C-alpha cells in the first residue's frame, strides 16, 4: 500500500495558506479541478507523496463542492486518502470481488496556474455509506505524474506521509473491513495521548485506527482524522517548523503543527 496523497479539506483555501505560512510549511499552488467547484494547493515531499489542501472555489458553497463536501463544510481537515497503483481497473475489480461498492474508474483533472492540464483516473470505494472515506481511492496518472506533483522547494526534515490515522466507529469492525479488502495484519494497540480515542497501529502498513465520537461520525463519517508526516530527526523538524511539544506514539514520538487549523490533524512522527 503506497500512499499517493492525503486530501486536507477546509472551507477557505486562503485560511489554510495563512496557517501554512505561520507554521513554516511551504506549499505550491495547484489550481482548480476541472469541474470548477474546488481548488487546491499542495506540499510535495521527497518520497513522492503529498498533502493536498482543498477548498471550494470562490463563490461555491462547500456543500456543492465536487469533492468531499461534508469535510470541506465541516472543516474536518483530513478528508480522504489516495494510494498509487499500477492498474486502476484491476484495483477496482479487486474491490468489487471483495464485495465493496465502487464509483469508477473516473477521469479526473485540474488546471494548474501555469495553464497545464493534469489528468488521472481514480476509483472511489464505499464501505457502507455514500460519504464513507475509510478506504483509500486508487489513482493512476494519464499525464506524467511530475505534472501533478513534485517536491516543494523548502521542505526539510520531512520524508513524506508516514501514517494516515483513520477515525472509525469500532476498531475491530474497521480492522475486519481492511482485512477483507487488503489482507492487512492485525492492528496492534499503542499507548498515546496524541488523540482522544484508543489507537491501533497496523504493522507494515501506513495506517492507524482510532475510535472517534458519535458527533464526528454523524458530521463526516468514517474517514482520516489525522495525517502524520515522517521524519528521522524530530529535533530538526521542530527547528524548521512550528510544532507542539512531542508526545508518545507507541514507541515513537509525534508533534503537531502548532496552529488551530492543523493541531490534532497534521503532525510529524519520528
Indicate where each model-derived feature is located.
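Glyoxalase I/VOC metalloenzyme domain signal
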Residues: 1-3, 8-28, 45-270
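Conserved catalytic-core motifs of GNAT/GCN5-like acyltransferases
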Residues: 29-34
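N-terminal low-complexity or amphipathic/hydrophobic leaders
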Residues: 36-48
Amino acid at each position: 500500500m503506497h500512499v499517493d496523497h492525503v486530501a486536507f479539506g477546509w472551507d477557505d483555501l486562503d485560511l489554510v495558506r495563512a496557517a501554512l505560512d505561520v507554521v513554516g510549511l511551504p506549499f505550491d499552488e495547484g489550481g482548480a479541478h476541472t469541474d470548477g467547484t474546488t481548488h487546491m494547493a499542495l506540499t510535495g515531499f521527497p518520497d513522492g507523496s503529498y498533502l493536498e489542501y482543498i477548498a471550494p472555489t470562490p463563490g461555491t458553497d462547500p456543500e456543492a463542492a465536487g469533492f468531499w463536501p461534508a469535510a470541506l463544510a465541516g472543516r474536518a481537515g483530513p478528508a480522504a486518502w489516495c494510494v498509487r497503483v499500477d492498474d486502476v481497473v484491476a484495483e477496482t475489480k479487486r474491490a468489487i470481488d471483495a464485495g465493496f461498492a465502487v464509483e469508477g474508474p473516473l477521469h479526473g483533472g485540474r488546471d494548474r496556474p501555469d495553464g497545464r492540464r493534469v489528468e488521472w483516473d481514480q476509483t472511489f470505494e464505499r464501505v457502507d455509506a455514500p460519504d464513507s472515506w475509510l478506504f483509500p481511492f486508487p489513482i493512476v496518472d494519464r499525464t506524467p505524474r511530475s505534472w501533478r506533483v513534485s517536491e516543494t522547494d523548502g521542505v526539510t526534515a520531512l520524508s513524506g506521509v508516514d501514517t494516515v490515522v483513520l477515525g472509525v466507529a469500532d476498531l475491530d469492525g474497521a480492522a475486519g473491513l481492511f482485512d477483507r479488502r487488503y489482507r492487512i495484519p492485525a492492528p496492534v494497540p499503542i499507548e498515546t495521548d496524541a488523540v482522544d480515542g484508543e489507537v491501533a497501529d497496523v504493522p507494515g502498513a501506513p495506517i492507524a485506527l482510532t475510535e472517534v465520537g458519535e458527533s464526528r461520525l454523524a458530521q463526516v463519517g468514517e474517514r482520516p482524522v489525522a495525517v502524520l508526516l515522517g521524519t528521522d530527526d524530530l529535533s530538526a523538524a521542530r527547528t524548521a517548523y512550528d510544532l507542539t511539544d512531542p508526545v508518545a506514539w507507541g514507541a515513537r514520538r509525534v508533534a503537531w503543527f502548532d496552529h488551530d487549523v492543523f493541531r490534532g490533524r497534521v503532525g510529524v512522527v519520528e
